Amino acid sequence: MIISMSDILCVTNRSLCKEDFFVRIEKIAKTEAAGIILREKDLSEEEYQALAEKILTICQKQKMQCILHTHTNVARKLAYNAIHLPMPILRTLSKEERDAFQILGASCHSLEEAVEAENLGCTYITAGHIYETDCKKGLPGRGVEFLRNICEAVSIPVYAIGGINPENICEVKKAGAAGGCIMSGSVSYTHLTL
C-alpha cells in the first residue's frame, strides 16, 4: 500500500512546534497533505480569528485546504466555509448553519457519534483515539477494530486520530480510513511535512 501526504490531515498545536509556527505552516502548506486543521484550543475567539487570518493567507497562497476548528463565529466573520467541530458544538447548530459549510468535520469517539455526525451533514469525521498517545496519557487507544467498525458504518471519509505515525498509517488505511491525522507541530514528523 502506497501512503502519501494526501492521506494526512495535519492538526495544529503551537505548543508542540519546535520552530516558528508560521514557518512550519508554510512548510506544511507546500506539501501534498490533505489539509491543515487549525485547532489551537487555548485561544480566545478574538485571538483565534487573528491567527486564522494569517494562516488562511498562507494556505490560500499555497492552495492548501485549511479547516478552522470550533469557532463557528470566526468562520462566519471570515466568510469561510470549512470547519471541524467537537460533537457537542455540532449538535447545537441548526441545519441552515451546518449547510453553510462546504467542508464540515467532527471529532467522533464512538460508533454512535460517527453515525450521528454523518446524519448531521458532516462531509468527513475524525475517529479516535486509535493508538495510545501523549495527548491522552494513560488511556489505551480504542484500536483498529473500533476504527474499522466506524468506517463500515458511515459513507463519508474517516480520518484516524491519536498516535498516528508512519509505522501505523498503513494499518488504519487497511481498516478503511481515508487517512490519518498528525499533530503538525511535532518535530518527530518533520520528514512527513517537508
Specify the residue positions occupied by each region the protein language model found:
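Catalytic cores of alpha/beta
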Residues: 71-80, 110-120, 164-178
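Alpha-helix-loop-beta-strand connector modules within alpha/beta enzyme cores
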Residues: 53-65, 102-107, 141-159
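Glycine-rich beta-to-alpha transition loops that act as phosphate-gripper elements at the mouths
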Residues: 14-15, 66-72, 87-88, 106-114, ...
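Glycine/Thr-rich beta-alpha phosphate-binding loop at enzyme active sites
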Residues: 78-85, 105-148, 152
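Catalytic beta/alpha-barrel core
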Residues: 35-44, 62-91, 102-113, 126
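Conserved small/polar residues in nucleotide/adenosyl-binding loops
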Residues: 190-194
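Active-site mouth loops of central-metabolism enzymes
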Residues: 6-20, 105
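Active-site-adjacent beta->alpha loops and helix N-cap segments on the catalytic face
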Residues: 42-55, 84-99, 112, 133-148
